[in-house]
Amino acid sequence: MMPRDVRAPTIPVPFHKLLKVVAIVDAADLQTKQLLDHIAAENFEVHVSGSFDRDVSEDASVGAYIVLVDGDRLEQARKFARSVRAIGFQTPLWALADSHRISDLAVLALTGEVDGYVYLGQQTPAFYAKQIVASLVKYGLSLLPPFFGGLAAYDGEANITFACPGHQGGQFYRKSPAGQLFFKHFGENVFRNDLCNADVDLGDLLIHEGPAAEAQRHAAKVFGADTTYFVLNGTSTSNKVVTNAVLRRGDLVLFDRNNHKSLHQGALVQAGAIPVFLPTARNAFGMIGAVDWDAWDEDHLRERIRTNPLVKDSQRANAERPFRLACIQLATYDGTVYNVRKVLEKIGHLCDYVLWDEAWIGYNAFHPLFEDHSPMRLEDLGPQMPGLFSTQSVHKQGAGFSQA
């Protein structure tokens, strides 16, 4: 496989098409105008404004800011810089000042808050434009996650394949009037980047190498997991992967009655595990609620094993960890969400593993509202706690494309 460094692509990523420059400056100043003209000559979109009044959180397409800090604008510039950093953006910030202010301590107080200074008259506008564009490109490369970065680098090389998919980069659609409409509606890039998995330049999910494997490791870090695997067909297939990997015929599985049918298929039909069902609440309006709290009680669960007609050996109820796996719908279809820590305090020591179906709550690891409601974010778990699985559908509550 050809090594591909996402941070140093063979063909430069066309950031001039992807990121813009925002200049909060005096556009009437001749040298400032020359600076902006040089940036525009590199085909970058340049937005000029005289006011710091802008909602930076609403415009994530900015690749660099140039802000005038002369006179009474200094404090406004500092507040603006802090507002950019406060939302987590690391967008390059350049402070623009007259050359006579190079020793002005007030301007130097911006050190650490901006990425560089533009002292018009000290260097040429062309040189400063190069510096700003270089910082934008470096910033753009830092934004690229492993797989998309590899894909952008691959696309930049204008590779062509004669394998599948049969639309051949969208060229098939261009051969008919209806196809032309389809092609133009989506644009060429979506077809050029629809690649066959046999094209190993972007890695291989089956043997876990290249950008695909790097993306899995990156996702694990982002979500707080030890390991992450990408699976086609969402949570349904992920549930079957986990249950078939963990369970074998005759194992006991603690089973939420709210579980999706994929868990019924994977755990009970395919793996052949024996369910101990957890009763769930349903109000007078038919809304699905949580498992009855008393049903998590250890004595109650062991008694359910003893009285289960499918369990032939009643002594299994006395095992230290009678359940090979617990399958729990973390968020019901009607919005009930479990406190994961509290549930694990009740049943964790009874299970080897717990699978949390997060199909409808894939965002819980990223908001303080859901503290203790995300399995991957739990800390300070004791030695009695089981192994934890989370299964998700990026195309449901994440931002992934829908699946056919």
Give the positions of each predicted feature.
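Alpha4 helix (beta4-alpha4-beta5 surface) of REC/receiver domains from two-component response regulators
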Residues: 100-116
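Terpene synthase/cyclase
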Residues: 125-192, 197
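Conserved PLP-enzyme active-site core in the AAT-like
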Residues: 49-51, 82, 90, 106-107, ...
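A short, well-structured beta->alpha microelement
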Residues: 6, 36-61, 74-75, 298-314
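Conserved acidic segment of CheY-like receiver
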Residues: 9-40, 44-48, 55, 67, ...
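Structural motif
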Residues: 23-30, 50-52, 66-72, 96-100, ...
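Conserved phosphotransfer microenvironments
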Residues: 30-34, 52-90, 97-105
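Conserved N-terminal alpha-helix of the aminotransferase class I/II PLP-enzyme fold
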Residues: 184-238
